[in-house]
């Protein structure tokens, strides 16, 4: 768990410094999370630099105005405090601004992947919410409404 928190801290620091890549020490779980980030388009990619030391280089992704797609990465479930959600309640979670990583009996999945899998099952599956990633994808119309609200 500490390795993963170090990876999240390195990504956040790299994004604040506008770095193109950061180097971290990886593990099986780190590779799994990074491949999910890459599939969702949150990072450009990652590459194993040194196999014996498990060093991984993460290539960060920015918008054209050099703002990052990632806003925050929260580790929700820790050793003593775990957050579980039932399969029936998955439909109520808003995936527009946040990306949820849920650990189920099928492994670590994003919320949309779990919803698709639940459509095929008789009884919907829930799981443990491990991580929440806040994404900087704000609709321009919503930004205008927020500005107008603050001007009044």
Swiss-Prot record:
SUPFAM superfamilies from the UniProt entry: Ribosomal protein S8
Highest taxon above the source species: Eukaryota
UniProt GO molecular function: structural constituent of ribosome
Pfam families xrefs: Ribosomal_S8 (PF00410)
Principal place of residence: mitochondrion
This protein's GO CC annotations: mitochondrion; ribonucleoprotein complex; ribosome
Disulfide bonds: none
Keyword Magnesium: no
Family of this protein: Belongs to the universal ribosomal protein uS8 family.
Entry protein name: Small ribosomal subunit protein uS8m
Gene that encodes the chain: mrps8
């Amino acid at each position: 768990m500490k390795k993963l928190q170090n990876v999240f801290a390195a990504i956040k620091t790299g994004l604040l410094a506008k770095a193109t890549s950061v180097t971290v020490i990886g593990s099986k779980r780190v590779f799994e999370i990074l491949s999910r980030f890459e599939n969702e388009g949150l990072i450009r990619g990652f590459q194993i630099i040194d196999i014996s030391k498990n060093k991984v280089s993460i290539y960060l992704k920015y918008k054209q105005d050099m703002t990052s797609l990632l806003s925050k990465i929260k580790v929700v479930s820790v050793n003593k405090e775990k957050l579980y959600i039932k399969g029936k309640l998955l439909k109520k979670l808003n995936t527009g601004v946040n990306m949820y990583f849920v650990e189920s009996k099928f492994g670590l999945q994003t919320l949309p992947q779990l919803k698709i899998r639940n459509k095929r099952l008789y009884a919907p599956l829930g799981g443990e919410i491990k991580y929440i990633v806040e994404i900087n994808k704000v609709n321009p119309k919503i930004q205008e409404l927020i500005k107008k609200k603050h001007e009044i």
